[in-house]
């Protein structure tokens, strides 16, 4: 009930999208209840690498709930299983912790491991690498999402600068 109240407050304040943490034991029943209470809200879930490809049936059920994306559902270093998952569901997979370098991003794009990429400049080696990842994603027609990791004001400014590029 507390979660539903917080979501109601966010919806009332006009937040365009709501991100929910999704983990074993706090997953499908919770998400179904949220969707039932807020049928028109835009949600995405962040799994923080909490699942494996053996949970494919769970993600097929999540697919029915019409989410904007599923962020980092599987282990961060398993781009192959992310590709298998993305081919098996219609909801876009967004890679986050998997994107630690330009090379990792290029490999994810090559394997079709996702349909969104969350770029964190602090994780990928700074703004120059973040822009290279953005450009590779744009060329592959994969939209980007910018995230932060509790940066300083300088780091936050990098995130804002990056978010102004055309593929965000």
What are these regions (language model features)?
Residues 167-168:
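Short helix/strand-capping turn motifs
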Residues 2-6:
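Active-site glycine-rich loop that binds ribose-phosphate moieties when present
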